[in-house]
Amino acid sequence: MTVLITGSSGGIGRSLARSLPALGWQLRGFDREPAAGDLEQVRGDITDPAALDAAMVGVRAVVHLAGQAVEAPWPVIRDANLEGCYQVFEAARRAGVRRVVYASSNHAVGFTPRPTGDPAELPADTPPRPDTLYGVSKAFGEALARYYVDRYGMQVACLRIGTFAETPPDARSMATWLSPADCARLVDACLRTDQLGFALVWGVSANSGRWWSTDTGQALGYRPLDDAGRHRPGSPGFAAQASDLLVGGAFTTPDFGIDEVADRSPRTRESRSG
């Protein structure tokens, strides 16, 4: 089975391009940037229907990672994460591709208070409560996915990804970390399961202090093995922040908003922020 990875030259894309072939998947990349290694890749932009149509030929599933990675001015968010997301789903529908794994984000629910009590885990179907325009765009993608499932019978897993990194970078990520190996395990499970209709799934490792439930992922066959607790905090960056009372962390603070990023150049269209 050939799987198309959009955003294949980005961080998660490169990681999956290394790990998924060992799990039996034949991959094709789609990105504006050149491919890493010997990955078969179609060069193009996710807002270009013709380029997407070419990339979808012979594909059985799509892992949609491409998009604006963090907060940005609205035109950037709109083009990459709304128009681009729509074009990917439409191209999949035209090509008869029935399964999509969509990279959503915890920032789709970022203003949700972090859980307390026992068990202190938010369910995967926590309602949208976005913390930024970026988060709004990810909530849009989830709603669009639901539409394509209900209207066209597609099968979609929306991964509310936490902090994707080689190791946990800060205190918050001790709860939100998704290791590269567990990311591959999660995507592999979503591609293989015969139980998929529409699913919201937390993209998180088996962290002993995680805020989010892995129940939905495990029902699809996800078996996370990595735990942020095995990594010892060794720097002042591991001090807890007041913003960690909300799921979105620093994205929820008053001084984090469009004014902060208005002068930035757009990032490469591949998702991942914590």
Residue ranges and their predicted role:
Residues 200, 206-223, 238-270:
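Conserved C-terminal active-site "lid" loop/helix of NAD(P)H-dependent oxidoreductases
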Residues 36, 43-80:
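NAD(P)H-binding glycine-rich loop region in Rossmannoid oxidoreductase-like domains
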Residues 47, 76-87, 95, 132, ...:
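Glycine-rich NAD(P)-binding loop of the Rossmann-fold in SDR/ketoreductase-type enzymes
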Residues 161-167, 177-199, 206:
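Alpha-helical substrate-binding/gating segment
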Residues 23-36:
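Conserved glycine-rich Rossmann-like NAD(P)H-binding loop of the short-chain dehydrogenase/reductase
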Residues 3-23:
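N-terminal Rossmann NAD(P)H-binding glycine-rich loop of SDR-like oxidoreductase domains
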Residues 79, 115-153:
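Catalytic helix-loop patch of NAD(P)-dependent Rossmann-fold dehydrogenases
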Residues 87-128:
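Conserved Rossmann-fold NAD(P)-dependent oxidoreductase catalytic core, especially the SDR/UDP-sugar
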